[in-house]
Design a protein with these regions (language model features):
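Nuclease and nuclease-like effector domains acting on nucleic acids or nucleotide cofactors
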Residues: 2-98, 107-171
């Protein structure tokens, strides 16, 4: 898959401080942004952190501040974001206009460093990265309260975050 090869290059270049996204970048996109606000599932299928299970949620995701212990640094995510903007073929190449987001959020035990779980989610539009953040929090709160299972929350947000609250019955 080209995204992973390009991502590997982006990581190496980013670590060396050599990558930049600009309007002059002329590369063909490999991922589609036609389904926005959802990512292209062939490029961003989502991934789970195997260290988070239903049986340990009260010592992982339900602990305040836990996501900070697993969140990758921007030195890791910024090169991925830069390459993802190219891969998704976004016309706006300003990195500040995107969040390098986890499709399956860390709040629900998403894989922190899996490139297939990260994508440049726009801050613009009717359903944005900020909108998804609210969905993530509501799902995590429902999981921690025992209203829904971790598996149900993960599946719903991975399949379509815009309908996840309705699908799980908490929206």
């Amino acid at each position: 898959m080209r995204r992973f090869t390009a991502t590997t290059c982006a990581l190496a270049l980013g670590a060396a401080g050599l990558i930049a996204v600009s309007a002059g970048t002329a590369q063909a996109s490999t991922c589609s942004h036609a389904r926005l606000p959802l990512p292209d599932s062939s490029c961003t299928p989502g991934a789970y952190n195997s260290d988070v299970t239903q049986s340990n949620i009260h010592s992982t995701i339900c602990v305040s501040g836990w996501t900070a212990t697993v969140r990758p640094p921007t030195s890791y995510t910024n090169p991925l974001k830069a390459q993802g903007i190219i891969d998704y073929g976004y016309s706006d190449t300003n990195m500040a206009d995107y969040e390098e987001d986890h499709l399956v959020p860390l709040e629900l035990g998403g894989a922190p460093r899996a490139t297939g779980n990260l994508w440049p989610e726009p801050y613009s539009g009717s359903q944005t990265a900020h909108s998804k953040d609210g969905v993530e929090t509501k799902l995590k709160n429902a999981v921690c309260a025992g209203t829904i299972t971790l598996s149900a929350a993960r599946s719903a947000i991975k399949n379509n975050w815009t309908t996840a609250l309705q699908v799980t019955g908490i929206g």
